[in-house]
């Protein structure tokens, strides 16, 4: 299947647009003057933010909700691993011959190439750490785009755009999504047993994090207890590079 390099004036259909990771990407692509339509069963905070910005969202699980201009085979379709293969929209676009049907992580991987990328990974602590870096950047006048796994109250959004110097993203290990990223810098906050429906055991999860570190171009920072080669470590103990 063809991978898309999205620029301007594309037509993009999001299946599950209200997801915290999907909605931030939708906002980014909408800023680039693409035509965005999304489906989500929920009317959550993310959906309300999208609608407030002018992005059309439907909660009707019906092919009748797809307008004519979204039915051509050149429409880009974005979905998440949470969307089952028998989803009626996904089945429709596959049967329709759409060549650009991609997971959210693949689109985020393309976005991460646009500027110097800082990726925050870890079983726990990703959103908190990303939010702290966002605060430091914003307070320091550093220009950045941030794709955050939570709604920042001070911005009322999970997508923040102040410029192009850096791209700040959460690196999600679910479904090995973070292997699509292209980080210059990365932080791993923790590695603990999680998503074993995907990985089977902790060993496979650790191996996936190791593969993620192999994609880091410049600097890797990890919790000192993580058994992965790193440039800098952090801890509450004094035997790490940085400690409190």
Model-derived segments and spans:
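Phosphate-binding loop of NTP-binding sites
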Residues: 3-10, 28-34, 51, 64-71, ...
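Conserved N-terminal Rossmann-fold NAD(P)-binding element of oxidoreductases
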Residues: 13-17
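N-terminal Rossmann NAD(P)H-binding glycine-rich loop of SDR-like oxidoreductase domains
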Residues: 18, 26
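N-terminal Rossmann-fold NAD(P) dinucleotide-binding loop
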Residues: 22
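NAD(P)-binding Rossmann-fold cofactor-contacting core
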Residues: 33-49
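Short, conserved SAM-binding/catalytic segment
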Residues: 49-56
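Short acidic-hydrophobic, aromatic-tinged amphipathic segments that line or gate anion-handling sites
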Residues: 56-61, 102
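Acidic beta-strand-to-loop metal/phosphate-binding motif
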Residues: 76-80
């Amino acid at each position: 299947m063809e991978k898309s390099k999205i620029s301007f004036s594309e037509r993009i259909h999001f299946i599950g647009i209200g997801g915290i990771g999907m909605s931030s990407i939708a906002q980014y692509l909408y800023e680039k003057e693409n035509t965005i339509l999304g489906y989500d069963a929920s009317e959550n905070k993310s959906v309300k933010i999208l609608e407030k910005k002018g992005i059309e969202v439907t909660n009707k699980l019906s092919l009748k909700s797809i307008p004519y201009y979204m039915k051509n085979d050149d429409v880009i379709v974005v979905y998440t691993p949470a969307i089952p293969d028998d989803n009626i929209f996904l089945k429709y676009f596959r049967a329709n011959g759409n060549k650009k049907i991609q997971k959210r992580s693949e689109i985020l991987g393309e976005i991460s190439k646009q500027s110097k990328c800082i990726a925050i990974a870890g079983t726990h602590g990703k959103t908190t750490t990303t939010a702290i870096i966002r605060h430091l950047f914003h307070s320091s006048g550093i220009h950045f785009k941030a794709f955050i796994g939570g709604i920042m109250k001070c911005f009322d959004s999970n997508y923040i755009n102040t410029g192009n110097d850096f791209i700040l993203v959460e690196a999600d290990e679910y479904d090995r999504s973070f292997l699509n990223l292209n980080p210059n810098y990365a932080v791993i906050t923790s590695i603990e047993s999680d998503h074993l429906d995907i990985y089977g055991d902790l060993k496979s999860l650790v191996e996936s994090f190791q593969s993620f570190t192999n994609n880091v171009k410049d600097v890797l920072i990890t919790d000192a207890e993580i058994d992965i080669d790193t440039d800098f470590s952090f801890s509450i103990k004094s035997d790490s590079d940085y400690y409190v």
